A protein has these predicted regions:
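Secretory N-termini
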Residues: 1-85
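Extracytoplasmic/secreted envelope proteins and their assembly/folding machinery
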Residues: 25, 29, 67, 102-103, ...
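A broad structural signal for alpha-helix termini and local helix breaks/kinks
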Residues: 36, 74, 109-110, 125
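Soluble periplasmic/extracytoplasmic beta-strand elements of cell-envelope proteins
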Residues: 43-45, 52-54, 80-82, 93-97, ...
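Primarily a LysM-type cell-wall glycan-binding module
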Residues: 48-52, 57, 86-113, 147
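Extracellular LysM carbohydrate-binding repeats and other cell-envelope/extracellular binding modules
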Residues: 69, 73-87, 116-147
Length: 147
């Protein structure tokens, strides 16, 4: 499906150790499964600082969430997705910059006056986001289409 870039030094630290070393495949798989997305049959491999995810998922939403759950991990700079989902589309991702908030991101993607749609972005990134105000520079978010 493609290779997606992430910021290696930004993200959630998992496993033991420190710095921005890539986590093990087992640690990444455990992190992915902890979100209870329905990714039990997804395989995770590591090649340097690139994570490779392979398998079938139930829908586009899970596919995109799996990519960002793995990519928003400290030490991962790229995610190669070999995931498949019914009626698959190219995902839209956004890398958070300093000074961003979900309202501002919503207006940038959906148009002026659509900042109140920030909740659509928040809901699309749960359970990786726990609160609309808890985003950080370098974090990658999925931007769903508006219905």
């Amino acid at each position: 499906m493609g290779i997606f870039d992430f910021i290696k030094s930004a993200g959630k630290a998992i496993g033991i150790g420190g710095g921005d070393e890539a986590p093990t495949a087992d640690a990444l798989k455990k992190e992915l499964d902890s979100h209870k997305l329905g990714t039990e049959n997804v395989k995770v491999e590591i090649n340097g600082d690139k994570a490779i995810v392979t398998g079938d998922v139930a829908d586009q939403s899970i596919l995109e969430k799996a990519i960002i759950a793995v990519g928003n991990t400290l030490g991962v700079s790229k995610v190669e997705s070999n995931l498949t989902a019914p009626s698959q589309k190219d995902p839209v991702f956004y890398t958070v910059k300093k000074g961003d908030n979900l309202w501002k991101i919503s207006e940038a993607h959906y148009g002026k006056g659509k900042g109140a749609k920030y909740n659509v972005i928040f809901e699309a990134n749960k359970p990786m986001l726990s609160h609309p105000d808890k985003i950080y520079p370098g974090q990658v978010l999925r931007i769903p289409e508006l219905d």
